[in-house]
Amino acid sequence: MLVGYARVSTEGQSLNRQIDMLVDYGLDKRNIYQEKISGTKLRRDQLDKMIEELQEGDTVIITDLTRISRSTKDLLNIIDRIKEKGASIKSLKDTWLDTSGDNPYNSFLLTVMSGLSQLERDLISQRTKEGLRSAKARGRNGGRPSKRNDKADTVGLLYREGYKIVDIVKQTELSRATVYRILKDLNLK
């Protein structure tokens, strides 16, 4: 069975052009899942419902790649989910995307896209690690600043003077857990 997916990014946009293309291709309008949501959103209810309802041998038809995904990684994940159901996907505009047959050219392009996606993830990871090392070398450890820096001495002083934890919490406006953590760091608890 042919199953269609049409998506626009905002409520103000119309799905009519995509639906017309899918119907012209031979889809029954009742088999077209429609969505008005940004492609960058990972949770797309109609897309998820369509994939869930796919049967072995079904083919998902889209007008073009940007309607189903905004990133290579997301596209590859969606294609994998469709293939796991025993179905295939075909794009009307991006004719290289057709997993319904054993076309070596299409398989090659998907493999290249997968490799590029992995390369992108690896480069991001490498840049992140380099940035963290560079920041550490400049004396920056990352994370949010500790509240302890401002009020640790006050907490220690009040505790040594016999104040109860509840009173220290009120005076310093720190949480109970933070007060206990400071006392532990100061070897007072």
Curated annotation (Swiss-Prot):
For this protein, the DNA-binding region equals 165-184
| Keyword DNA-binding on entry | yes
In this chain, the stretch annotated as Disordered covers: 130-151
Residue span, Resolvase/invertase-type recombinase catalytic domain: 1-139
Q: Does the keyword tRNA-binding apply?
A: no
Active-site residues, Swiss-Prot/TrEMBL: S9
Q: Which GO terms describe its biological process?
A: DNA integration
Q: Which domain of life is it from?
A: Bacteria
InterPro entries with a match to the protein in the record: Homeodomain-like_sf, Recombinase_CS, Resolv_N, Resolvase-like_N_sf, Resolvase_HTH_dom, SSR_resolvase
Alphabetized UniProt keyword annotations: DNA integration, DNA recombination, DNA-binding, Plasmid
MF term (GO), any: DNA strand exchange activity
Give the protein's function.
A likely role for the res protein would be to stabilize pCP13 by reducing the number of plasmid multimers resulting from homologous recombination.
What family is it from? Belongs to the site-specific recombinase resolvase family.
**Under which name does UniProt file this protein?**
Resolvase
Which species does this protein come from? Clostridium perfringens (strain 13 / Type A)
The taxonomy runs: Bacteria, Bacillati, Bacillota, Clostridia, Eubacteriales
Per the record, the gene is: res
